[in-house]
């Protein structure tokens, strides 16, 4: 096999090599059954065992309390932008949203189709380079829920704290930072996460929802989008994305083998610190984000001269450092360093950046 590259893609993102090798070994013949997971009935004993283990492993990793349901759904996080409102926002009701970047804004725009949305705080006041402190927020006393995105993959902002919302359920889009470190699930009413960053391949979204929030869907909510229907049917109201579910389960197994989220969190802290420390010490590279609000998962950086962007990317590709181009809306570069990216990838990137700076700085 040719040497695998270091993949810094924001999503679909790198998967652990051990998971890919396991999937490869089981592709044609899962556990001696003579068929692939892709060919199994989702209601077979074999697949039900896969699904059950995946859920239990995720519960173990995040210490999910028993009064929360874990759902494996379709449509990605973008579908959740509507699904949340259809389930949790009553007719003539109101919800509070925190704006920290493009993904927050997409959630706000979609939810606005179904009710009154109060933007309780916005990072726009800081040009999206810092997160407004909670003392600046203007939360509604009668909000059905408070929604925020703990990590903005495009801008590179991340909360290092959990908002206080009292009795109002806190809803979080954790598509890009779930499983990156320990988390107190009990602080949230609901968490959702598209799989293709820290969970598995694209095609599935994980929803962790407190049981008392089920059964609130509006009359116009399609059956397929009703969280209670999904929970009552074990996430199998219709045929689920079985391959993505299976692969996500393999990632959960791998995470447990690595020592769980505590061990992964320590690795991630070292990874992000190594990269940011180099960028901050450099004269060629820069990161504009307020230091306490910097993302552990997505590190945007710019070169002092935009004319160097193309040669930088070409050289990176030649060195097996892939998908470093920043999002088209912000430009520059971005290194997405999710759980599957190890310190060797960070060291290789820093070494290349040093060499490039010596040549072009």
Curated annotation (Swiss-Prot):
A GO term, aspect molecular function: O-phospho-L-serine:2-oxoglutarate aminotransferase activity
Cofactor annotation: pyridoxal 5'-phosphate
UniProt pathway annotation: Amino-acid biosynthesis; L-serine biosynthesis; L-serine from 3-phospho-D-glycerate: step 2/3; Cofactor biosynthesis; pyridoxine 5'-phosphate biosynthesis; pyridoxine 5'-phosphate from D-erythrose 4-phosphate: step 3/5
Keywords, sorted A to Z: Amino-acid biosynthesis, Aminotransferase, Cytoplasm, Pyridoxal phosphate, Pyridoxine biosynthesis, Serine biosynthesis, Transferase
EC code(s) of this entry: 2.6.1.52
UniProt GO BP: L-serine biosynthetic process; pyridoxine biosynthetic process
InterPro entries assigned: Aminotrans_V_dom, Pser_aminoTfrase, PyrdxlP-dep_Trfase, PyrdxlP-dep_Trfase_major, PyrdxlP-dep_Trfase_small
Residue(s) carrying N6-(pyridoxal phosphate)lysine: 197
Gene3D superfamilies: Aspartate Aminotransferase, domain 1, Type I PLP-dependent aspartate aminotransferase-like (Major domain)
GO CC aspect terms: cytoplasm
UniProt-annotated binding residues for pyridoxal 5'-phosphate: 77-78, 103, 153, 173, 196, 238-239
PANTHER family xrefs: PHOSPHOSERINE AMINOTRANSFERASE
Subunit structure of this chain's protein: Homodimer.
Family from the record: Belongs to the class-V pyridoxal-phosphate-dependent aminotransferase family. SerC subfamily.
Stated name of the protein: Phosphoserine aminotransferase
